[in-house]
Each structure stands twice: as structure tokens, then as C-alpha cells.
């Protein structure tokens, strides 16, 4: 634990609720060039229907969240992005069409970041400063620094935030835990909401117990097209309500955690953002 770290108002644990806001971008044509209608409409449930249930749950529980949003979603669903902002949540980047970053060339990935940044700024009225891509390439960190991003969220290697450094640039990493709804529910139509709730409570409980020794960071990764379905939405609401019953919990947006991490940078690990280091 890091005994030099201090969350606002002496709170002992920062909970980051993040939602990867995507739609049919993940549904690729088959070898005949045809789209699977069932898979497409399942994915589109998120931006067309589920997002409104998610926003309602967040409002009812009184917590803030971060929406990692595909540029294509922002382009096609401007009112949904506007509602996210109006409800006090953060909009960050998640690729344009949920591209697999490791499969992109340097120039292709640069174009995705630039296009996504511009579209989110157009729809949200504010430039995004956080990013999470579908996988990560050896070029990702340097490209995010090049484009002025504050934070990234793709690593699973630490519990607490840490700093990537390259030349005169610094990028905050907000690490993830591999227990999101995508794994709990198999992304589409499997999994038990009660089992997911047990997993998420266990994640929080362990971090909360450890926070007696020093402030902790507890990230959650959800998807509107997964966790907004009836039954699953109840599990989402229940885990938030469960955490809210504990003292000293800070429900923070990604930028809030990242800004404080940067401010207290001397107390956090620093790693070189080298292509060789990332690839290894």
C-alpha cells in the first residue's frame, strides 16, 4: 500500500465506475460480407436502450462514472453523449469503431485517436483526456502523450495508479481488474447476475479491508449493452448500493483520480513508456 497517498477528505478508497460505451462496431461481417443481425441488435441495445437505464441507476444511487466512448457512438448517438455530460459524468475515448489497437499501424492508430478526439469534443462540448482502447499497441502510450491525453486505462499490472514517462511527457495509468461484466457474463447471453454480484463484492471487500493500511483504488469495468439488461441492471445497482453503505468511499471519475495522481506524482511508481517495455 502507499501510505503517502491521500484521497480527498481523507476517504480511504477510490471507486472508479467505468462503462465502455460501444455498439455494433464489434460485429464484423462474415466471409460473405454479411452482418449477423442478432449480434448487431444485441450490441446496439447499449446506445439505443440500455444507456438510459444506466444513467437512471447512477442518478438514483448518486454516484459519478466515466464513459469510455467510441467516436462512432458519439457520431451516431449525440443525444446519449449529451445526456452523459449533463448528468455530470466523464466522457473519454474508446477508439472510433472499437478498433483492435494491436492490429493497427502507427499511422492508423494516430488517425483513430485524432478522429475519436475530434468527434467526442464535438458531441460532448469538451475534449476527452482519458482513453481505453480495445487492446493496446506498442505505439499507444506515445501517441496518447503526443495528443495531450492525461490518462490511459489498459494495464492490469498494478492495483494503484502509476505514471508512464517518455521524454518530457507523463501519462497516468489507471489500472483495471479482470472482473468486469464482459467476463462475468460472456459479453452476451451467459452468466448469472448473482454470481457477478458475489465477484464484485469480493473485489470491493478485499480492497476495502486493505484500505485500513493506506488508500486503495477499486476500478470496475462495465458495458451498457451488457449490464443494462433487466436482471443484470439490478446487480449493477446492488453493487453500487452495497459500496455506498461503507464509510470513506469516493466514487471518482477517471480524470479526478488521474489529476490527483499527477499532483502527488512523487508517491507513485514511474515506468518508461518505451515500445520495448510495453511490448514485453
Locate predicted features.
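Catalytic alpha-helical scaffold of carbohydrate-active enzymes acting on polysaccharides/glycoconjugates
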Residues: 1-174, 197-220, 226-280
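Positively charged, amphipathic and often flexible ligand-engagement surfaces
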Residues: 161, 173-195
Amino acid at each position: 500500500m502507499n501510505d503517502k497517498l491521500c484521497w480527498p477528505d481523507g476517504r480511504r478508497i477510490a471507486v472508479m465506475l467505468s462503462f465502455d460505451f460501444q455498439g455494433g462496431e464489434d460485429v464484423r461481417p462474415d466471409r460473405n460480407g454479411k452482418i449477423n443481425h442478432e449480434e448487431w441488435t444485441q450490441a446496439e441495445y447499449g446506445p439505443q436502450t440500455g444507456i438510459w437505464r444506466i444513467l437512471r441507476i447512477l442518478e438514483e444511487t448518486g454516484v459519478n462514472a466515466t464513459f469510455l466512448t467510441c467516436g462512432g457512438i458519439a457520431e451516431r448517438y449525440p443525444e446519449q453523449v449529451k445526456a452523459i455530460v449533463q448528468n455530470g459524468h466523464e466522457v473519454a475515448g474508446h477508439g472510433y469503431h472499437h478498433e483492435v489497437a494491436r492490429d493497427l499501424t502507427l499511422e492508423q492508430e494516430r488517425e483513430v485517436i485524432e478522429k475519436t478526439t475530434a468527434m467526442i469534443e464535438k458531441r460532448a462540448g469538451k475534449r476527452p483526456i482519458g482513453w481505453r482502447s480495445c487492446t493496446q499497441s506498442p505505439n499507444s502510450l506515445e501517441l496518447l502523450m503526443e495528443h495531450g491525453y492525461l490518462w490511459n486505462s489498459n494495464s492490469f499490472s498494478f492495483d494503484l495508479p502509476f505514471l508512464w514517462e517518455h521524454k518530457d511527457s507523463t501519462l497516468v495509468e489507471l489500472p483495471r481488474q479482470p472482473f468486469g461484466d464482459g467476463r462475468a457474463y460472456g459479453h452476451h447471453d451467459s452468466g448469472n447476475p448473482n454470481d457477478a454480484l458475489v465477484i464484485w463484492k469480493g473485489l470491493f471487500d478485499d480492497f476495502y479491508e486493505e484500505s485500513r493500511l493506506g488508500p486503495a483504488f477499486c476500478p470496475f469495468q462495465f458495458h451498457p449493452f451488457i449490464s443494462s439488461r433487466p436482471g443484470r441492471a439490478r446487480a449493477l445497482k446492488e453493487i453500487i448500493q452495497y459500496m455506498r453503505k461503507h464509510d470513506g468511499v469516493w466514487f471518482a471519475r477517471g480524470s479526478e483520480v488521474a489529476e490527483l495522481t499527477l499532483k502527488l506524482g512523487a508517491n507513485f511508481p514511474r515506468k518508461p513508456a518505451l515500445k520495448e517495455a510495453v511490448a514485453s
